[in-house]
Amino acid sequence: MAEKQKHDGRVKIGHYVLGDTLGVGTFGKVKIGEHQLTGHKVAVKILNRQKIRSLDVVGKIKREIQNLKLFRHPHIIKLYQVISTPTDFFMVMEYVSGGELFDYICKHGRVEEMEARRLFQQILSAVDYCHRHMVVHRDLKPENVLLDAQMNAKIADFGLSNMMSDGEFLRTSCGSPNYAAPEVISGRLYAGPEVDIWSCGVILYALLCGTLPFDDEHVPTLFKKIRGGVFYIPEYLNRSVATLLMHMLQVDPLKRATIKDIREHEWFKQDLPSYLFPEDPSYDANVIDDEAVKEVCEKFECTESEVMNSLYSGDPQDQLAVAYHLVIDNRRIMNQASEFYLASSPPTGSFMDDSAMHIPPGLKPHPERMPPLIADSPKARCPLDALNTTKPKSLAVKKAKWHLGIRSQSKPYDIMAEVYRAMKQLDFEWKVVNAYHLRVRRKNPVTGNYVKMSLQLYLVDNRSYLLDFKSIDDEVLEQRSGSSTPQRSCSAAGLHRPRSSLDSVTAESHSLSGSLSGSLTGSMLPSVPPRLGSHTMDFFEMCASLITTLAR
């Protein structure tokens, strides 16, 4: 049983530091959290034990936890870990930044037909996955469909789910009335899957029309409309999708569309990504990823056998097992997102040079090592283009010859794992800006002053990465801006083109596990006189100690 701790004034639970509140529910809050070692953001649902007992929802919570632990699907929110304290349960789940589909529709109105189809295809794929695992959601609605940064759908909140067995019928009436099927509000027996189909029909209608097919403030009148099954179809809806809606919103559950019927419908099949309904589903394959195991070993300074034992033990609370699944899921999320976006809008430039390469979020091409093939397009249509935020405005950019940093052909995850290991060994303190950008400081034992620098991993070319070191001097920033800069302000770590005002000095290349090589140069900002206290020398000593530790 874990205990809550304080970390820089914030609550720390296990390896996660809790931040802002994302939402408040019946049983507690949902806060954003950050894994101390990996920097991954998570959503932490905090459930108060006393409130759960007083509301008599112990069974509901247990079902939610049980169901989420079973699921590994690209469009279902994942549950990584459950941490227990004497007063609360902390459910560590996948974090998505786009908010609820409900809020998106309220803000933007109805969605374009192609976009509505894309989101609906993702939602139905997730529902099909649930049903194949004998689970019915029973409370599908736009509020329970979340959106990630790439506008992909993620189904959440399985608290009202029931495990579905052959020949077993569900009799419990639950969920939201606007989205509930007629047999649910009437208290009749129902098998399960058909009630999710009805709710999916209501969601599809909301996407296409921006309103609900059945709505009334007077609940008895609302129930009458749902039982009648009569709803308005706008003229702008094409005939094909209208027939699909009418089939899904059939009052008689025996005549209602099945997932098989929807998948075979001509409107649904248009531009359907193959990964959503694979011929041989492999979401839950029990294959151990050797590279992920090695990454966990590097982050936690443990042996491969320890990680394997944790995975084979079947203990979902084991820290090594949790870290392993975090690595796998984050890698898979990016790969899957790129696969179905590439199908409709191939990226330009160097992305095409190496189809197997995927740029993780937060990793930027180096501003002075941009391949000449990358050029600004009139309009970036592919979401992967958003990752490349430093495209040059002109191809005639002068390339810098020297940098202070380390160049490597290792994978970015491996490089950052080595950096974390070295910083921990050197007792550095750091703040994660994103997975590949850190602000680091070390206290000078003699003067008591803090020496600060920024570490940023850049993409140099298709196979090389540069870990760039940049000095951060609060007094220098104050001289340049005319105002003091807060210690933890991200503006101090903003991107600047490195220009050397000192004589560049190269050092012998160092080997890091046979893959990293280092070169030293000046990276100080020009036109600012050096201040007292030898900040420049402290900075170089800090760099040298980190490079030396990395080279071991």
Curated annotation (Swiss-Prot):
Q: What is its EC number?
A: 2.7.11.1, 2.7.11.31
Instruction: Give coiled-coil spans as residue ranges.
Output: none
Please list the residue ranges that the record marks as compositionally biased, kind Polar residues: 480-490
- Annotated localization: Cytoplasm; Nucleus
Give the Gene Ontology MF terms in alphabetical order: [hydroxymethylglutaryl-CoA reductase (NADPH)] kinase activity; AMP-activated protein kinase activity; ATP binding; chromatin binding; histone H2BS36 kinase activity; metal ion binding; protein serine kinase activity; protein serine/threonine kinase activity
In its record, the post-translational modification comment is: Ubiquitinated.
Please tell me whether the keyword Membrane is annotated for this protein: no
Notes concerning its domains: The AIS (autoinhibitory sequence) region shows some sequence similarity with the ubiquitin-associated domains and represses kinase activity.
Stated name of the protein: 5'-AMP-activated protein kinase catalytic subunit alpha-2
The major lineage groups are: Eukaryota, Metazoa, Chordata, Craniata, Vertebrata
> Gene name?
PRKAA2
